[in-house]
Regions:
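Leucine-rich solenoid repeat scaffolds
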Residues: 202, 206-249
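Bacterial N-terminal signal peptides
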Residues: 1-7
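The feature captures the LRR N-terminal capping module
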Residues: 7-44, 237-249
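Consensus "Asn ladder" position of solenoid repeat domains
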Residues: 36, 63, 90, 114-117, ...
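LRR N-terminal entry segment and analogous cap-like coil->beta motifs
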Residues: 21-74, 83, 88, 92
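Inter-repeat linker/turn residues at the boundaries of leucine-rich repeats
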Residues: 26, 50-53, 77-80, 104-107, ...
Length: 249
């Protein structure tokens, strides 16, 4: 996905409050600051703005706010009504995810998009144990640093029961991670699971495809993995029933 980025100097020159007024929707429920590269300092200023209290959807893709910026936002009482938060490409790291997870205000999120943020296994335990995500339906963690260990942490979580979409594309989930998901009974509402490009072989793919633990599943994406005939056969058997779409190429 490509965004038009303003230079750092230009973004900093514009007062953040002016940017907000220009980019907030007419009904003041959606704020789109995509690609402005506002950085940690302006993220802190943003967090202090009372005008955010009506915002339900916040787009902050490509702003390099880092852990310092998201910590300020996570501590802002003005974001208590937020339901949709997109943080693609912000260099949040594990400290950033931990700040989101521990926020006393970000408890109403329905979608949380954290792709390409250098998130590793280290912070996933905080995510998995948090009671803040009772309403979360969409969780995007693609393009991060998640290994089989981290995948198992997510798979074993009992606090993500409402998820309908889980995206772990382009991590290092591997066979052990795929098997952990196949054994999980904690995703009764999951409709879409994306595990493409995760170094998964037939050993992990087949039990996941054959798992009976995803009653609502509609799409299982295993594309761009190291898959052979056993996976193709398992996918064919499921695909012909036309209830679940298995992508494996």
């Amino acid at each position: 996905m490509a965004f038009l980025f303003l230079s750092t100097a230009a973004a900093q020159a514009a007062d953040i409050s002016e940017l907000v007024e220009k980019r907030i929707s007419a009904d003041r429920t959606t704020l789109d600051l995509t690609g402005l590269n506002i950085g940690p300092q302006d993220a802190k200023k943003l967090a202090a703005m009372e005008s955010l209290s009506s915002v339900i959807t916040l787009h902050l893709q490509g702003n390099r706010i880092k852990a310092r910026g998201i910590k300020a936002l996570a501590r802002s009482p003005h974001l208590v009504n937020l339901k949709h938060l997109d943080l693609w490409g912000n260099l949040l790291g594990d400290r950033g995810l931990k700040a989101i997870v521990e926020s006393p205000y970000l408890k109403n999120l329905v979608s949380l998009k954290l792709w390409k943020n250098e998130i590793s296994d280290d912070s996933l335990e905080f995510l998995a144990k948090s009671r803040n995500f009772a309403n979360l339906k969409v969780l995007m963690l693609n393009d991060n640093l998640i290994t089989p260990f981290g995948a198992a942490i997510i798979a074993e979580s009992e606090n993500l029961l409402q998820l309908t979409t889980l995206n772990l594309f382009r991590n290092e989930v591997g066979d052990d991670g795929a098997i952990a998901f196949s054994k999980s009974a904690h995703f009764p509402s999951l409709e879409s699971l994306f595990l493409g490009e995760n170094s998964i072989t037939d050993k992990g793919a087949v039990p996941l495809i054959e798992s009976q633990n995803f009653p609502a599943l509609k799409t299982l994406d295993l594309g761009k993995n190291l898959l052979g005939e056993p996976t193709a056969l398992a996918a064919f058997k499921i695909n012909r029933k036309e209830k679940v779409r298995i992508i494996y190429r």
